[in-house]
Amino acid sequence: MATTVPLFSQFTCKTPITSSSTSSFQSKSPILLPINPINRRIAVHRHDFKVRASDVNDEWGPDSKGRGGDVDDEWGPEIGLNSSVAEKVAEEAIESAEETERLKRVLAGSLYGTDRGLSASSETRAEISELITQLESKNPNPAPNEALFLLNGKWILVYTSFVGLFPLLSRRISPLVKVDEISQTIDSDSFTVHNSVRFASPLATTSLSTNAKFEVRSPKRVQVKFEQGVIGTPQLTDSIEIPEFVEVLGQKIDLNPIKGLLTSVQDTASSVARTISSQPPLKFSLPGDSAQSWLLTTYLDKDLRISRGDGGSVFVLIREGSSLLNP
């Protein structure tokens, strides 16, 4: 009795055809294999052969898991190592930044009450010098002249070891005139520096300033050439309050009996100050090689700048508006 073979049970086989003209092989009709018990067992259990074949050790290892993670190849271990190194570097950077901010706050606190260094004791000077050295070693911009935009703006002088400024800071000009502010304004686009000393008196304020050009000579050093000096006209103080008494050598002197006389003198002085204030500022040139100097920036960030000048004198400046000005 003939066996009927369903269409989906047929296996098509073709013989290879060679391109050689001498070959005698030709295409033949498909051979239909009848399904018998042996063939059926092969078809049914074919997946068993696949499972056993996957157990064979090849270049990827004993199983597919070894391809991605457990097998040590050129990608696996190094990725983990680089990740650990990156995390450690990031942690060290954060710790260094926090330590720098702490040192800045300590320095600002140490400068308080020193009158820009004039009134600092030897112990305080030594402490400030040590803090400056530590900050210089942590300079976040070791090549500050390659980041000139950080120099832009107005900087307030809060400390110096430059003895040439001490006579000015000691108020030898007049007992009633004091140095109110010393500042430096830098414009890196035009390569200009504007130094200003503002004086204050009971009636008015005035300033002495210099305009200069600077040239970049190295990643840290700039050459400064002063071109012009300016004496600002006095600006009248908005309001003056006469106290009821003053203390002289430990004794209080009552000013009420002569308050009327003082008011009259004040009005006269105010009139003179208004007349002077209407005049233009006095400008004068600064010729010669003596009007040149250089500055070495040893620390720079968005709030704090430390520079060293001729003879090793140090200048500590804080950007206007920074919270470091109010420790």
Curated annotation (Swiss-Prot):
Pfam families in UniProt: PAP_fibrillin
Alphabetical keyword list: Chloroplast, Coiled coil, Plastid, Transit peptide
Main subcellular location of this protein, as a coarse class: plastid
Keyword presence, Transit peptide: yes
InterPro entries: PAP, PAP/fibrillin_dom
Disordered, as annotated region: 56-78
Tissue: Expressed in anthers, sepals seeds, fruit coats, and leaves. Very low in petals and pistils and not detected in roots.
Residue ranges that the Swiss-Prot or TrEMBL entry lists as coiled coil: 85-107
Subcellular location: Plastid, Chloroplast
Gene Ontology cellular-component terms listed: chloroplast
Residue interval of the organelle targeting sequence: 1-84
Induction comment: Down-regulated by drought and oxidative stresses. Up-regulated by wounding.
Function: May modulate the action of carotenoids.
Family: Belongs to the PAP/fibrillin family.
Entries under PANTHER family matching the protein: PLASTID-LIPID-ASSOCIATED PROTEIN 4, CHLOROPLASTIC-RELATED
Protein name from the UniProt record: Plastid lipid-associated protein 1, chloroplastic
